[in-house]
From Swiss-Prot:
An MF annotation (GO) of this entry: tRNA binding
Record: residues binding CTP: G32, R35, R116, D159, R162, R165, R168
InterPro entries in the record: Bact_CCA-adding_enz_type3_sf (IPR050264), CCA-adding_enz_C (IPR032810), CCA-adding_enz_firmicutes (IPR023068), NT_sf (IPR043519), PolA_pol_head_dom (IPR002646), PolyA_RNA-bd (IPR032828)
Gene: cca
PANTHER family associated with the record: CCA TRNA NUCLEOTIDYLTRANSFERASE 1, MITOCHONDRIAL
Residues that, per the record, bind Mg(2+): D45, D47
One BP annotation, GO: tRNA 3'-terminal CCA addition
Subunit structure: Homodimer.
Name of the featured protein: CCA-adding enzyme
Length: 402
C-alpha cells in the first residue's frame, strides 16, 4: 500500500530519512504515527527507525544528544526540529515483566518490527509513502481489530504493561480485541502486579479519557485485569456501577473528573488514601477530593457563595457534570451567578492584610490574627462586608469589642 501524500509532520522529517539513506543505511517512519495517518487521526510524535547503529547515526548528523543510546536512541537536532532516531533492535529475555535483559542492535527491519506489541503498531513507512506491513496490520485496521504481533502470550509475558496498553488502544481507537489476544491478556493479567503503579496509572488514565472509554472499561472488567490494579481487587460490581450510573454518551472533561466519578461509584470513603495507592501527585489528590466533596455536598443541599469561594468554579462545574451524567438535577446558571456575585475569589484579594492590622489596630501576630482574617474573609464572601479598608477596620474593631 502506498499513501497518496505524506502529512506535514512526515514531510518535515523527510530530510532526516534521506540523509540516513544517503549514508548507506535504511530508515523508516514507524509506530503509532503511521497507524494514525492510516486512520486519518492527528499525528503526535514521529518516530524514526534505522539500520544505522547509534555511533553511525551520530556520524551522519552534526548535532545529536544521547537520550537513550543504550537502547539505540539518538536525538537529532536538525533545522530547528528534534527527531528521535532508534536503531533496529531485538530484545533478550525480559526482567520484571517490563524491561528486556539485553538489547541487541540489528540491521533487519523485520527483526525490529517483530518485537512490537500489536499489529497496528508494527507498520513502517518509507520516504516514498509505501507502507510496510509484515504482520497483516492493514487487515486488522480494516476490521477494527487489535491483535498481538506473533504469539500473544509471549508479548504479554515479556511486558505486562502491554495488557493495559491494549485496553487503552481499544478505548481510543474503538477496536475490538482479537480473541486469542484477549485470552492471553486474561491469562497474564496477574503480571500487572509486577508493573510500576505509575505506569499502570498513566494507561488507565488515558483509557478513562478516551472517546470509547466504555469499551475499554468493559474489556478491563471482562479480562479481570482490574483485580491486579491498586484498590480494585474484587470490585467488579462497583466498576460495573461506574458504567451503568453514567449517561452512555458521557465523556470526561478531565482526569480529575474521571477519577472522582470512579471513586464515587466505588463508594470510597477516603479519596486521598485511594489515590495515594496509585502514587498520584498531592495536587491531583486535592482536586479529585474536592470534586468528590462537592458532589457529596450537593446530595445534601444547594450551592452557596461559600462553596463557590472554597472550591472554585472549575471544581464545582466538574462535580455538577457528574451529576448531569447521572441524570440528576443540575444548575450551571446558578454556579455562574454565584461566582459573578463573589467580591473576592482569593484571600490575597482582600485589601487589608496582617501588616495593616498590626499597623492600624496594634493587633499582634498569632492565632488571634489568623482568626480575625478568617472572619473578614468569610464576611466579604457572604456579602456582609465590603472589601474596603475603612469598612474592614470598623468590622475588626466591632469584632474585638464583642
Amino acid at each position: 500500500m502506498r499513501l497518496n501524500y505524506l502529512p506535514s509532520e512526515f514531510q518535515k522529517a523527510l530530510p532526516i530519512l534521506k540523509k540516513i539513506k544517503k549514508a548507506g543505511y535504511e530508515a523508516y517512519f514507524v509506530g503509532g504515527s503511521v497507524r494514525d495517518v492510516l486512520l486519518d487521526r492527528p499525528i503526535h510524535d514521529v518516530d524514526i527507525a534505522t539500520s544505522s547503529y547509534p555511533e553511525e547515526t551520530k556520524q551522519i548528523f552534526k548535532r545529536t544528544v544521547d537520550v537513550g543510546i543504550e537502547h539505540g536512541t539518538v536525538l537529532v537536532l536538525e533545522k530547528g526540529g528534534e527527531y528521535e532516531i532508534t536503531t533496529f533492535r531485538t530484545e533478550e529475555v525480559y526482567v520484571d515483566y517490563r524491561r528486556p535483559s539485553q538489547v541487541n542492535f540489528v540491521r533487519s527491519l523485520e527483526e525490529d518490527l517483530k518485537r512490537r506489541d500489536f499489529t497496528v503498531n508494527a507498520f513502517a513507512l518509507n520516504e516514498d509513502g509505501e507502507v510496510i506491513d509484515l504482520f497483516h496490520g492493514l487487515d486488522d485496521l480494516d476490521n477494527h481489530l487489535l491483535r498481538a504481533v506473533g504469539l500473544a502470550s509471549e508479548r504479554f509475558n515479556e511486558d505486562a504493561l502491554r495488557i493495559m496498553r491494549g485496553l487503552r488502544f481499544s478505548a481510543s481507537l474503538n477496536f475490538d480485541i482479537e480473541t486469542t489476544t484477549f485470552e492471553a491478556m486474561k491469562k497474564h493479567a496477574s503480571l500487572l502486579e509486577k508493573i510500576s503503579v505509575e505506569r499502570s496509572f498513566i494507561e488507565f488514565d488515558k483509557l478513562l479519557l478516551a472517546p470509547y472509554w466504555r469499551k475499554g472499561m468493559l474489556a478491563l472488567i471482562d479480562s479481570h485485569a482490574f483485580n491486579y490494579l491498586p484498590c480494585l481487587k474484587n470490585r467488579e460490581l462497583q466498576l460495573s456501577a461506574f458504567l451503568s450510573q453514567l449517561d452512555k454518551d458521557f465523556l470526561f472533561e478531565t482526569s480529575e473528573q474521571a477519577w472522582a466519578s470512579l471513586i464515587l461509584s466505588m463508594e470510597v470513603e477516603h479519596t486521598k488514601t485511594f489515590l495515594k495507592k496509585w502514587k498520584t501527585s498531592t495536587h491531583f489528590q486535592k482536586d479529585v477530593e474536592h470534586i468528590v466533596d462537592v458532589y457529596r455536598i450537593r446530595e445534601q443541599m444547594g450551592l452557596t457563595k461559600e462553596h463557590l469561594y472554597r472550591y472554585g468554579k472549575t471544581i464545582i462545574k466538574q462535580a455538577e457534570g457528574i451529576r448531569k451524567a447521572r441524570g440528576l438535577m443540575v444548575d450551571f446558571e446558578k454556579i455562574e451567578q454565584l461566582d459573578s456575585e463573589l467580591a473576592i475569589h482569593d484571600r490575597h484579594e482582600i485589601v487589608v492584610n496582617g501588616g495593616t492590622l498590626i499597623k492600624k489596630l496594634g493587633i499582634k501576630p498569632g492565632p488571634q490574627m489568623g482568626d480575625i482574617i478568617s472572619q473578614i474573609e468569610l464576611a466579604i464572601v457572604l456579602g456582609q462586608l465590603i472589601n474596603e479598608e475603612e469598612a474592614i477596620l470598623h468590622f475588626v474593631k466591632q469584632y474585638l469589642m464583642d
